[in-house]
Curated annotation (Swiss-Prot):
Quaternary structure annotation from Swiss-Prot or TrEMBL: NDH-1 can be composed of about 15 different subunits; different subcomplexes with different compositions have been identified which probably have different functions.
Name the UniProt record assigns to this protein: NAD(P)H-quinone oxidoreductase subunit J
Organism for this UniProt entry: Parasynechococcus marenigrum (strain WH8102)
Catalyzed chemical reaction(s): a plastoquinone + NADH + (n+1) H(+)(in) = a plastoquinol + NAD(+) + n H(+)(out); a plastoquinone + NADPH + (n+1) H(+)(in) = a plastoquinol + NADP(+) + n H(+)(out)
EC primary class: translocase
PROSITE patterns (UniProt xref): COMPLEX1_30K
Matches recorded under InterPro entries: NADH_DH_suC (IPR010218), NADH_quin_OxRdtase_su_C/D-like (IPR037232), NADH_UbQ_OxRdtase_30kDa_su (IPR001268), NADH_UbQ_OxRdtase_CS (IPR020396)
Domain of life: Bacteria
One GO term of the biological process aspect: photosynthesis, light reaction
């Protein structure tokens, strides 16, 4: 990433001795195309992970879709802890390519990548919606808003999905304070 990256640091620890992870095949392709991103460590099963800034998320997602990553398997969020960052992730698969490959070789390796956007919890975290690229992002982005308070610019239905409309706060944030009592209105 460039020196002007908007990805907030994970903590205040000295990271000068940390070696950057090797770029995987998708990260290398993004570098060749001139996209700014950050290669992250692969996850526990070896899936390539890439950090991107919120501003370039739709551009990189569109580039990956045009490069065969045509299926959003999962989108979600998580909280790294009180005072730490919020994270949105997007797990993309090359599904059409995989189906064709499996027709001739059932053991064909699936191409997949996980994009991560790191957000500061200060103020209102906002990301551009990728609903226009992947329709499956609809309820997944709404759930992430509902549980973590991350807003998605350009989403056609920006409202709570699971919690009542008048709910205060974001229940899956680690700094969330549970209300003593919440009275549900009669359903009829």
């Amino acid at each position: 990433m460039s020196e002007t990256s908007k990805i907030p640091p994970a903590s205040t620890e000295d990271t000068s001795a940390v070696v950057a992870p090797a770029a995987g095949p998708v990260s290398q392709w993004l570098q060749q195309q001139g996209f700014e991103h950050q290669a992250l460590e692969p996850d526990h099963v070896g899936i390539e992970q890439i950090g991107v800034d919120a501003a370039v998320l739709p551009i990189i997602a569109a580039a990956l879709k045009s490069n065969g990553f045509d299926y959003l398997q999962c989108h979600g969020g998580y909280d790294e802890g009180p005072g730490e960052r919020l994270v949105c992730f997007y797990h993309l698969l090359a599904m059409a390519e995989q189906l064709e490959a499996m027709a001739s070789d059932p053991a064909a390796q699936l191409r997949e990548v996980r994009l991560k956007v790191f957000l500061s919890r200060e103020g209102t975290p906002v990301l551009p919606s990728i609903y226009g690229l992947f329709r499956g992002a609809d309820w997944q982005e709404r759930e992430t808003f509902d549980m973590y308070g991350i807003q998605f610019d350009g989403h056609p239905h920006p409202k709570r999905l699971l919690m009542p409309e008048d709910w205060k706060g974001w229940p899956l944030r680690k700094d969330y304070v549970q209300p003593d009592f919440y009275e549900m209105q009669d359903a009829y």
